[in-house]
Amino acid sequence: MTYTATGSGAFRSKGGSLSEKLGYEFAAIKTETDALRAVDAAGLKIAKGTLAGGLANAFSFAWQNPEASAIVVSRVVIDVTTVGAVAGALLDVGPGATATTHSDTLIDGLDITTAVITADNITNKGSNGLSLCKLDAAGGTTDYITGQILVQAAAALVGKYYIFYTVV
């Protein structure tokens, strides 16, 4: 999920003995595997991807259910790390039939212009947003989650999206 190995130059320049350096790296790996084990035990899966900037009405992302079964999407997190939008730009997120289907039933009208923001469909769902949705199996009628830029351009938008789901 988040562990990144220390580069050889940085590893050499770290203080401490070789044993201490290796101990630190192994502890970081253990923390990561413990977190993955907990997620796996709960059956929760997390998909992530990169937000793309674009003009008004462009799609910032489109994620297709990769599973051979239906899934329940319990949370979508939008993490805007660089604001790059014209005042008034919004983001709608929701389930769709294709990679270019507009939907606002998870997040409706998220303001992506005022600040770096981490938002989700629970706290920041807007007027039409729901706490969860069900997607069809891959290739089904409704098997996408899309994020569409609305009203104004967000050409320099930078960030990630995270989709939390459970196979049904």
Protein language model features and the residues they cover:
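Surface-exposed, low-hydrophobicity beta-strand/loop segments enriched in small/polar/acidic residues
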Residues: 6-14, 22-168
